[in-house]
Amino acid sequence: MASTPLLVELGAEELPPSAIEPLALALRDGIAKGLADADVAFASAHAYATPRRLAVRVEGLDDKQPDRDIERRGPALAAAFKDGQPTKAAEGFARSCGVTVDDLIHLETDKGTWLGYRYQESGEATTALLPAIVERAVQALPVPKNMRWGASRTEFSRPVHWLVMLYGADVVPATVLGLEAGRTTRGHRFHAPDAIDLAHADDYLDALENAYVLADMQRRRERIREQVLAEAEVNEATAVIDEDLLDEVSGLVEWPVALTGSFDERFLDVPAECLISSMKANQKYFHLLDAQGTLKPLFITVSNIESRDPQQVIEGNEKVIRPRLADAAFFYDTDRKQSLASRRSALESVVFQQSLGTLADKAQRIEAISSFIASRIGGDADHASRAAQLAKCDLVTEMVLEFPELQGIMGTYYARQDGEPEEVAQALHEQYLPRFASDDVPATPAGLALALADRLDTLTGIFGIGQRPSGTKDPFALRRAAIGVLNILVKAELDLDLRELLELAAAQHGDLPKAEGLVDDVLDYMLDRFRAWTQDEGIAVEVYLAVRARPVTRPLDFARRIRAVHAFSQREEAVALAAANKRVSNILSKQQHDGSTSVDTGLLQAEAETTLSTALEQCHQSVRPLLDAARYAEALDVLAQLRGPVDAFFEDVMVMAEDEAVRRNRLALLASLQSLFLEVADIAQLQQ
């Protein structure tokens, strides 16, 4: 069967930069799914996109569907003939198949013999299927917001102007979004505005590049990266390439040209983060640092044209950025006229959540939690309390209202200016750490206390009003808050009891609609986040389940047990001991054992049970100090030595002895074995 490349390109006015790549990938996936559903084979599908086009190229596309062998079943043979003559049922079936009764066959099945007909159905030509496939793919695109244009009732993200559909060298006759398919595309709006007729689908990328368009998203992104780095090198600086900004800029240009501009050094008196946010958010500029990591009065802009006069483009950008940076300087100067502490009253008019009060209420709650945590971790409770009082004050400053991503950062700057203790100032920024899984945790005790308190307050409050996350909905980012708490406690090695902290946090809220069982619900939710954490660490979920089966409420202790059980699970003895513990659990459960672990050595009869009893006693003496010191890995190493005695016991000893006293004693021996392992985890869970 012959195979040929397919090209589909939809030309439009400038699309939203954030939507370009998702739309192109969705178009690719929609066409690929349509082809697969139609049983048309192809080798691969690739997505391309620029601000003015979405395109898909399918390689090795078969020219038709495969032929299919069809089998139709008619009436039962007994009903198909009477006295050797075909009945109306047989004749009607033959007519429906377009043949005579003589052309029909007998089909043998488990339910008897039937009249049937077999024939081969030719596959439909791919070009006949493509219009509907492409139309469905386009209609299914996740367009953020549709619009209409002109007198047409057609809707799309932006007005569309051309449609290319080429199967090899041939145009596929089709109409999509009111556009008739052809072979004519467009190049760069300014460098190559004339129409471009494509002779073949394979010509697409080269033809566009010759017309100053890089259609490949990844290639365009890397071209920008290379140019930005090269410009930085020329200026003896380091370019900071934010990947999100790189993606956005890539969605704004078809033919990237990086240029370096400058701004007045007087703006460097403004905190660097403010200037960077302004350049990034307003103008999509990349900033440059000197060898010491200090912001330089330079920026890199990515133009969409190769100008004959690059300096004019640079000067235009410098003219545009000047008032933007002046605004940032104005916000900074205005904010500094008022102390952070004086803004606390303004928090009374900012609602945190309708049922949970204002930001002033939240600040009061986290003050109590922060000071408690600080005292528990050896920090300064007064510093933690002061940090909590000021924690949300920068949210009502001009700078943060303009650039919300600077929350905490500006609080630190303003607190330092106000003469607050350095730990207090630093905590205002640290309260938002970690921002993602691999991010740093706070470095100061006040920062640790504040970061924990803020998240615990949010978790208990939102759960307490019955708005816990469900499915994909998590409007208050509770998953991130829970993971943040776990990360802080584990990475900072804070051995705090999460239940105790949650009880304190819940108490600060007073009456909550869902107060009953609140602490247990939040605790379970948070500890369940360890499941994803273990998977990210490459640890089997059975290890998580083994630890989760125990009533462990200290996340640091939980993590230590996870690592210890993971190491144990790699040992040769682990499989046998996990199986043995599962067997023990089943036996004790079935016999409804009372939990007694007291073994009467006088009732030990078999050598194997005596050996196991002695081994358990020795292990208990060796393991107890290790458990008390939370040295779980070493404890499990000791317990691994029980494999031999345990195997011998189950091989040589009948647990369910006829003598009731002996039977109870053996059950107690098994309960003693189980309880020793349960000091760390339920390793029976490893046997899944």
Swiss-Prot record:
GO molecular function: arginine-tRNA ligase activity; ATP binding; glycine-tRNA ligase activity
EC number: 6.1.1.14
An individual GO BP term: arginyl-tRNA aminoacylation
Keyword Nucleotide-binding found: yes
Main location: cytoplasm
Compartments (UniProt record): Cytoplasm
Annotated keywords: Aminoacyl-tRNA synthetase, ATP-binding, Cytoplasm, Ligase, Nucleotide-binding, Protein biosynthesis
Catalytic activity: tRNA(Gly) + glycine + ATP = glycyl-tRNA(Gly) + AMP + diphosphate
Quaternary data: Tetramer of two alpha and two beta subunits.
Family indicated by similarity: Belongs to the class-II aminoacyl-tRNA synthetase family.
NCBIfam families: glyS
Protein name as catalogued: Glycine--tRNA ligase beta subunit
The encoding gene: glyS
